[in-house]
Swiss-Prot record:
Gene Ontology process terms (BP): amino acid biosynthetic process; aromatic amino acid family biosynthetic process; chorismate biosynthetic process
Stated role: Stereospecific condensation of phosphoenolpyruvate (PEP) and D-erythrose-4-phosphate (E4P) giving rise to 3-deoxy-D-arabino-heptulosonate-7-phosphate (DAHP).
Enzyme class: transferase
Metabolic or biological pathway: Metabolic intermediate biosynthesis; chorismate biosynthesis; chorismate from D-erythrose 4-phosphate and phosphoenolpyruvate: step 1/7
PANTHER family: PHOSPHO-2-DEHYDRO-3-DEOXYHEPTONATE ALDOLASE DAHP SYNTHETASE, PHOSPHO-2-DEHYDRO-3-DEOXYHEPTONATE ALDOLASE, TRP-SENSITIVE
Any Gene Ontology CC annotation: cytoplasm
Catalytic activity: D-erythrose 4-phosphate + phosphoenolpyruvate + H2O = 7-phospho-2-dehydro-3-deoxy-D-arabino-heptonate + phosphate
InterPro entries per the UniProt record, alphabetical: Aldolase_TIM, DAHP1/KDSA, DAHP_synth_1
Superkingdom field: Bacteria
Name of the featured protein: Phospho-2-dehydro-3-deoxyheptonate aldolase, Trp-sensitive
Assigned protein family: Belongs to the class-I DAHP synthase family.
Pfam families noted in UniProt: DAHP_synth_1
Organism: Escherichia coli O157:H7
Claim: Amino-acid biosynthesis is one of the keywords in the record: yes
Length: 348
């Protein structure tokens, strides 16, 4: 009989289960308290109960655990310095959506060579998240794959659904199941209505198919996530200006949703020129000084060294520099955070 299925796949290996990985890298009581408390603080900021600003900042993607931990250690110092004005969360992105093809992130390809040792990638991701949280730094990530969230979601304080997946029904269902607040990016064309629709969908209860912690495919009923919000990331043109934010708030108001949002300084808002993140920062700081309460948070891409680099086989990588989108360097990061804290001071 002719085969009609699995004609374009080849088995590689079995995937470790979330339960097995959690046994190797368990959440300690201290980390559990830290994650729970940071989620609550973020929720209060997004609801307007806390006047401080949520600052999600870090490398475009994680590829080197040593450099990531050095960045986290430096970020913890900034957290301590500005904790009365800012809730600083480290961007720890392990999955990269690609427009066509390219490196898909630490989980998929931890060796950066197309070997796709996913079990090892999952282990590295969980190990790093534990270490960063043990430092006292909350973590943020994009939830892209429908399976990998089960391996790391217990260590995440804030999640994002990307511009390419905000319209996806299964990602909206996943967001309704997640235990952390979730931001939805506007579409790559700049359309914010799809993010508002995603917020509404994620607030509802859904039947959701997912592997459980033991790898058994399971039918879950979600209770809905009340902490969905828009991430203004720009599109064909930036959308961080005051009139753009007012228009987004009008749409939120139309559906009785909280008029609080997050502004992404990178991507479409910096027109893929990383140093323009500083210009976006100046504009947002002025809006905050002018009394804007809609801006609950910001996102920025920064690392130890400015810019980006290509992966070239046989050649060493520059330590602390991005291998995906270009990032601000550490000195600019310190300046950006200081400016944000100074602007938020006017809210008090």
């Amino acid at each position: 009989m002719n085969r009609t299925d699995e004609l374009r796949t080849a088995r590689i290996e079995s995937l470790v289960t979330p339960a097995e990985l959690a046994l190797r890298y368990p959440v300690t009581p201290g980390v559990a308290t830290h994650v729970t408390d940071s989620r609550r603080r973020i929720e209060k900021i997004l609801n307007g109960e806390d006047k401080r600003l949520l600052v999600i900042i870090g490398p475009c993607s994680i590829h080197d655990l040593t450099a990531a931990m050095e960045y986290a250690t430096r970020l913890q110092s900034l957290r301590n310095q500005y904790q009365s004005r800012l809730e600083i969360v480290m961007r720890t992105y392990f999955e990269k959506p690609r427009t066509v093809v390219g490196w898909k992130g630490l989980i998929s390809d931890p060796d950066l060579n197309g070997s796709y040792r996913i079990n090892h990638g999952l282990e590295l991701a969980r190990k790093l998240l534990l270490q960063v949280n043990e430092l006292g730094v909350p973590t943020a990530t994009e939830f892209l794959d429908m399976v990998t969230g089960q391996f790391i979601a217990d260590l995440i304080s804030w999640g994002a659904i990307g511009a390419r997946t905000t319209e996806s029904q299964i990602h909206r269902e996943m967001a309704s199941a997640l235990s952390c607040p979730v931001g939805f990016k506007n579409g790559t064309d700049g359309n914010t209505r799809i993010a508002v629709d995603a917020i509404r969908a994620a607030r509802a209860s859904h039947m959701f198919l997912s592997p459980d912690k033991n790898g058994q495919m399971t039918i879950y009923q979600t209770s809905g996530n009340p902490y969905g919000h828009i991430i203004m990331r720009g599109g064909k043109k930036p959308n961080y200006h005051a009139d753009d934010i007012a228009a987004a708030c009008d749409t939120l108001h139309e559906f009785d949703l909280p008029e609080h949002l997050v502004v992404d300084f990178s991507h479409g808002n910096c027109q893929k020129q990383h140093r323009r993140q500083l210009e976006v920062c100046e504009d947002i700081c002025q809006q905050i000084r002018n009394g804007s309460t809609a801006i609950a948070g910001i996102m920025a891409e920064s690392f130890l060294r400015e810019g980006t680099q290509k992966i070239v086989g046989g050649q060493p990588l520059t330590y602390g520099q991005s291998i995906t989108d270009p990032c601000l360097g550490w000195e600019d990061t310190e300046r950006l955070v200081e400016k944000l804290a100074s602007a938020v001071d006017t809210r008090f």
